[in-house]
């Protein structure tokens, strides 16, 4: 029986709206210069740790696609198969998309802000169809009716996990090293599943931008090390703390 392959998770590098502290969701924004540098460094880390991917999965959003391209280029793996799916997209933040996080917190209060941002099953108010930051006219999502109008993390789990188990796991089972370049909440959804985290536990999980997270899995697709291993633990801890602090001030 072939050994199970390694799984490498990577949140996209810092985006323009990360830097501005805005709720992004499905709005298609690019990377900052810092985010591009993070993407290049992530590829270097992957190569240094001999985790050269055989296949890459990413979302339909440019911040993830660009990160993936830069990381693969840095690791000299631009030639591997790339598979994109909306199921790896960031959580849709509904009517919060485009809003400043600190201003939203000040307007609605800490409790409501954190419920929308980090709870497992509380979605923000839905976005209005045809509004500035909606996706109902985006051709990428024509086959799914323009996509959701809002999501909680449970919704992301429901759309991502079937794709993981039905598609991605097949590559892992034949020993391939799989790189997933996605988003804070789509990766939180996957980590919740892998580590069998409770709904309460997942509230406190923050995934930093641009730092690869390695999971080695057994034949049942359970991690040998719960929580995986960041390839740059010190930078990951600092990055996660920065994510946790968004909305302050």
From Swiss-Prot:
It holds the Pfam family His_Phos_1. One of its GO terms (cellular component) is plasma membrane. Keywords: Gluconeogenesis, Glycolysis, Isomerase. The record marks 183 as: Transition state stabilizer. PROSITE patterns: PG_MUTASE. GO terms for biological process: gluconeogenesis; glycolytic process. The active site is at 12 (tele-phosphohistidine intermediate), 90 (proton donor/acceptor). Pathway: Carbohydrate degradation; glycolysis; pyruvate from D-glyceraldehyde 3-phosphate: step 3/5. Belongs to the phosphoglycerate mutase family. BPG-dependent PGAM subfamily. Catalyzes the interconversion of 2-phosphoglycerate and 3-phosphoglycerate. Homotetramer, dimer of dimers. This is 2,3-bisphosphoglycerate-dependent phosphoglycerate mutase. The gene is gpmA.
């Amino acid at each position: 029986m072939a050994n199970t392959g390694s799984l490498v998770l990577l949140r996209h590098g810092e985006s323009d709206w990360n830097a501005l502290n805005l709720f992004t969701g499905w709005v298609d924004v690019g990377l900052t210069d810092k985010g591009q540098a993070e993407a290049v460094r992530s590829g270097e880390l992957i190569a240094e740790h001999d985790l050269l991917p055989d296949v890459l999965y990413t979302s339909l959003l440019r911040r993830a696609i660009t990160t993936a391209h830069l990381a693969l280029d840095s690791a000299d793996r631009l030639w591997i198969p790339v598979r994109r799916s909306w199921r790896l997209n960031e959580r849709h933040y509904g009517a919060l998309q485009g809003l400043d996080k600190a201003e939203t917190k000040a307007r609605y209060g800490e409790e409501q802000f954190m419920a929308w941002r980090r709870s497992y099953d509380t979605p923000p108010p839905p976005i209005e169809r045809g509004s500035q930051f909606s996706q109902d006219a985006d051709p990428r999502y024509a086959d799914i009716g323009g996509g959701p109008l809002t999501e909680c993390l449970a919704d992301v789990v429901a759309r991502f996990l079937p794709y993981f188990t039905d598609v991605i796991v097949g590559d892992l089972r034949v020993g391939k090293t799989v790189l997933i370049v996605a988003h804070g909440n789509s990766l939180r959804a996957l980590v919740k599943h892998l580590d069998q985290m409770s709904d309460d536990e997942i509230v406190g999980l923050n995934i930093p931008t641009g730092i690869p997270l390695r999971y080695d899995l057994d034949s049942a697709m359970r991690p040998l090390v719960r929580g995986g291993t960041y390839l740059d633990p010190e930078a990951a801890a600092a990055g996660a703390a920065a994510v946790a602090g968004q909305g302050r001030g």
